[in-house]
């Protein structure tokens, strides 16, 4: 019996669930739990617990996480993310902003927040 924690580097355009299904097909008797879902458009580490280690999945899920993002200024999309159609764009120059302006804006995105999906 295999017990352990896998760290899978999930590529863009593939769902977390597809990896779980693939593991289940490889070993049907394997008990599998994952520690959070990544959006299909996201890349990153998908943490998967196997057999006896599944009891630690909730502990690992509640651990602190870090995210890295790429921000595109001056573009508005139909979905509010990089996957949508660009519905508005404006010329943008960092010369229009001081480093303090950028720092103050970044601070607004730190900590817990609730996201409002586009209407």
Residue ranges of model-derived segments:
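Catalytic/RNA-binding core of pseudouridine synthases
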Residues: 1-119
């Amino acid at each position: 019996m295999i017990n352990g924690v896998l760290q899978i580097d999930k590529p863009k355009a593939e769902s977390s669930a597809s990896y779980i299904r693939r593991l289940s097909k490889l070993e049907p008797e394997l008990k599998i739990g994952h520690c959070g879902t990544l959006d299909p458009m996201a890349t990153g580490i998908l943490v998967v617990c196997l057999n006896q280690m599944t009891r630690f999945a909730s502990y690992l899920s509640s651990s602190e996480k870090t995210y890295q993002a790429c921000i595109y200024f001056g573009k508005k999309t139909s979905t509010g993310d990089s996957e949508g159609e660009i519905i508005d764009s404006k010329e943008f120059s960092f010369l229009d902003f001081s480093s303090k302006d950028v720092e103050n804006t970044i601070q607004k995105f730190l900590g817990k927040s609730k996201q409002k999906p586009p209407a």
